[in-house]
Amino acid sequence: MKYILAIDFGLKKIGTAIANTLDKYPSAFHVFEVKNNFKTAVNNLFLRIKNDGYELEKIVIGFPKFHYYSDIQKAIKSFKQLLEKRFNLPIILVDESNTTSAVKDKLITMDLKHKDFKKAKDTLAAVLILERFFQNYH
């Protein structure tokens, strides 16, 4: 079975979500430390996918569509190039507009502790990005 991986990119951490291509139901996957070392983050992501036995069809990355030529856009494009080299898969940029506010709204209703809130925020954003991909692109 093939899977699609979604990434919510950040300069400190990336949240990920995954779904198989049949039922298209995204679930939170893992949070990876970045700390401005994109290559290590990509390698850690690759190893985790491989060790967990997932066969990826493609990767989608949340991309801030309305921040023209921002530093985060440049960082995402650099990260995307590293992913393409390491995974040799199609990498699709998906508009992530309003995902942050949607995540905050969902998490507030969950009444989580601060530590759990921060951890869930990264993966839930990736889940929303993957849902958006299935609704609009797939």
From Swiss-Prot:
What does the UniProt keyword field contain? Cytoplasm, Hydrolase, Nuclease, Ribosome biogenesis
- Listed transmembrane segments: none
Where in or outside the cell it occurs: the entry states:
Cytoplasm
Q: What CDD domains does this protein's entry cite?
A: YqgF
- SMART domains per the record? YqgFc
Major enzyme class: hydrolase
Q: Please give one Gene Ontology molecular function term for this protein.
A: nuclease activity
Instruction: Provide the Gene Ontology terms for cellular component.
Output: cytoplasm
GO:BP terms for this protein? rRNA 5'-end processing
EC numbers listed for it are: 3.1.-.-
- Record keywords: Cytoplasm included? yes
Query: Which NCBIfam families is this protein grouped with?
Result: RNAse_H_YqgF
What the record says about family reads: Belongs to the YqgF nuclease family.
Give the protein's function.
Could be a nuclease involved in processing of the 5'-end of pre-16S rRNA.
Report the HAMAP family cross-referenced here.
Nuclease_YqgF
Q: Which PANTHER family match?
A: POLYNUCLEOTIDYL TRANSFERASE, RIBONUCLEASE H-LIKE SUPERFAMILY PROTEIN
Official protein name in the record: Putative pre-16S rRNA nuclease
Question: Which species expresses this protein natively?
Answer: Mycoplasma genitalium (strain ATCC 33530 / DSM 19775 / NCTC 10195 / G37) (Mycoplasmoides genitalium)
